[in-house]
Amino acid sequence: MEESSSIAMLVQEIGEPEAVLTAEGVLSPSSEVDQQRKAKADPLVHVIQKLSKIVGHEKSQKCLLIGKKRPRPSETANSLEKLENCEIPAKATESPAAGVRKTEMSQASSTLASNDGKAMSYQCSLCKFLSPSFSVLKEHVKQHGQQHDVMLMCSECHATSRSQQELEAHVVSEHENSASSQARSSPSGQGATERKSETMVDIPVNMGSPQTHAVQSAAMAESGRRKWYAYEQYGMYRCLFCSYTCGQQRMLKTHAWKHAGEVNCSYPIFENENEPLGLLASSMSAAPGGVDAVVIAIGDSELSIHNGPSVQVQICSSDPPSSSPLEQSTEEGVHLNQAVTLDANEEEMLEVMSDSEENLFADSLLSSAQKIISSSPNKKGHVNVIVERLPSAEETLPPKHFLINAEMEEGKSPSPSEAQTGCVGAGNMYHADKCTVDIGGLIIGWSSAEKKDSELSKGLAPDENAPPGRRRTNSESLRLHSLAAEALVTMPIRAAELTRASLGHYGDINLLDPDTGQRQVSGPLATYSKKIMSPLKNSTDGVTSFNQSNSTVVALPEGRQELSDGQVKTGISMSLLTVIEKLRERTDQNASDDDILKELQDNAQCQPNSDGSLLGSNVVEYIPDAERPYRCRLCNYSSGNRGYIKQHLRVHRQRQPYQCPICEHIAENSKDLESHMINHCKTRIHQCKQCKESFHYKSQLRNHEREQHCLPNTLSVASNEPRISRDAADGKCAQEGNKPSTQKQYRCDVCDYTSTTYVGVRNHRRVHNSDKPYRCSLCGYVCSHPPSLKSHMWKHASDQNYNYEQVNKAINDAISQSARVLGKSRGKPLLTSSEERTGPTTGSPENLVSSSELTSQLPGEVMDASELEKLNPTGCSSDVSGRSCSLAAPGTEYCVLLFCCCICGFESTSKESLLDHMKEHEGEIVSIILNKDHSTALNAN
């Protein structure tokens, strides 16, 4: 390894032999030879050394410091030659004062033998830089941009002082006769108020009991392969695969996709990451179970590089319960300004990592996101400490007292299903179990795969206001939402992957009303097809934990009525679905006339508490005085309109295999579904009626007609099929004379309008009888401009009874018929035909000529979607009627958008005025829409 300019921690040697750590650059030749011989024997060490050489050319890298532990040296011997086999990662830094530090290091190495074998070292709390000289450290602190006075803190008792002499005198007087084999688990915490706006310097490492070389090598290997990028001292991120450097986190996230195939590369998450916390993770991960390490990361919003709050974590070796310091903390609670002690077995290697870095060597970008969903435990024998910062961590909060349960039985580890904290008092006093510890907005939880089945059935705290033990960060939520969106599109049914035997009883399936679209499946697979945690208030049993690795389901206790809000938020799809619904509702509100009749029907037909099928199903909750009174209990969606909330409940419905997500068509197999989806996605083709040429754009078709067929530019191509007059009004039909197909052709008896359906000609016939606007039968939207109706129909693209392609052809055909009438009349009143009912047409060339105005349609002539579906075998439901008007001059284009009342013909250019007017007709509108008696008579005709 190359020589490093930093020096590791040097601690006092009192009583018993201790490990003295130093940089490899100052190791004696005998130590280097011994190290090289040991590296050859251990391939893991050899690999890590090579990796260190690769990344050693940058300004600041993490390096491995190797030392030895031997009996206490004599006062005349050089203590640097008496190092034991102990390996810890440390942060190596270079600065303009590197030469000064090297001089100080040489001076310190020559004076280590003095002062009765005791040595002191000063450490920067921002980057963990170590120096035996206080002057060098002060110069180093200035590199962080800190101009405040340096605050010194003792690593043994955390006593603080502004004077170097006072602190040195304190160390000599207070700790010269005390044993240093164990770190103190209950620091005094004094000077906590002085941490603000000042930089702390501490002496934090104290190595005690020896460990085997195998455990140390495993720790080195784990730390070496954990991160594929490094954070430089001067604010630069560096990729360890290709040496790419950048200064922003978003650039590193973009660069991560270039290494998506690497097993050691996962999507970086910086939600919890600041430099002190990152060094905390790397330092604690390499500490074996019997090593006492106190790592203190101190900083605040003014001084810390990443503006993170102060965090203190202390890990102590295992002690008998009678002598464990945890018992004292259970009596008084642990303050935020004190160190939190975690108890672990000596055989276990402690690992502290962020959630995205679990099992990093075996995960890809997608599988790491799956890990966040499942929260699966790590390998057996390891303790995963998941550290994440809550959104409230940036706020200044009063200290909270937490009780840590120290009664951990041997051979048992906490289950991830129990990673919840229960409320034991009305104040700020909580009880945290063995899985979670809260440190001022910082949650540290750990899990293990070892858990008895009897413990899995233990219920959570019955209080629904219990604080959650695990909250996902914003970065995790965004990744999970992306994964959920992908799952909803690519996986028609998720529940098929689960075994019914692995799922417990999930409440009462009949609690879901059929109106919500919830299918009555034979198993409790209702909402897990989308991985949505769906608590019902009246259910006695519920699913509280779902682990993808072993499909473990833990049942709630019988007295449990409702899951807490924190648990509801852990569902991966709920926030995504809520956003989608709110965007959809906002789009509907901004529409010109969309869904007016539907809103009037919903609001006029039923009172808030009269819908027993909706509110009585325990799925929709009605809050009388709220701005959005209707709230879905399966997620966080709320609305002020019953129609929206009923439409929203579709998202909780379980889809069948091979079901179309747009029109809910159920295919037989994947190929059938693929061919069906083409109908929703294929582009429109414009067919020339004079020849067999087809074009993708209307302009190409018009150019072709003008050049090849010598047709005027203002006219569209007239259809050359033979037509039989007056058969449309009488319901008669005839075969096309020049086509071998059996397609029927209907024709208007007044003009030359033709259609392939009787309904289309019948609706067109109203043009000659009364004044009618172009109207959408799905929502009541009216307009006088056919292209405006075409644009409007995009809003119904996801309707199950709507085919945009066929409706678009019908609109184009209506425009084309208008153009033909204009060409034949030449000064006569122009008849603007309406859009026909859906169905295949012979062609769709169009010329934009529209001059109609808006009036109303008579109540008796309103048709609903079910009637049209019966009359037309295509199953599409959209009819638009039009009316005629005169033009000021032939060929003049005139377009006006009016909002028309469908009852009395009231017209207004303002949507608000129409809404105010239509309140007078609410009863009539509801009766018209709900009246379906006339459909039988129409079918008979």
From Swiss-Prot:
Region (Disordered): 165-198, 455-477, 823-856
Modified residues (Phosphoserine): S95, S415
Compartment list: Nucleus
Zn-finger segments (C2H2-type): 122-144, 152-175, 237-259, 630-652, 658-680, 686-709, 746-768, 774-796, 899-921
SMART domains assigned: ZnF_C2H2
Biased composition annotated in UniProt, kind: Low complexity: 178-192
GO cellular component terms attached to this protein's record: nucleus
Domain of life of the native organism: Eukaryota
Main location: nucleus
Compositionally biased spans, kind Polar residues: 839-856
Keyword Nucleotide-binding: no
InterPro entries listed in its UniProt record: Zinc_finger/UBP_domain, Znf_C2H2_sf, Znf_C2H2_type
Record's function text: May be involved in transcriptional regulation.
Protein family (similarity comment): Belongs to the krueppel C2H2-type zinc-finger protein family.
PANTHER family for this protein: ZINC FINGER PROTEIN, ZINC FINGER PROTEIN 507
Protein name as catalogued: Zinc finger protein 507
Species for this entry: Mus musculus (Mouse)
Organism phylogeny: Eukaryota, Metazoa, Chordata, Craniata, Vertebrata
The gene coding this protein: Znf507
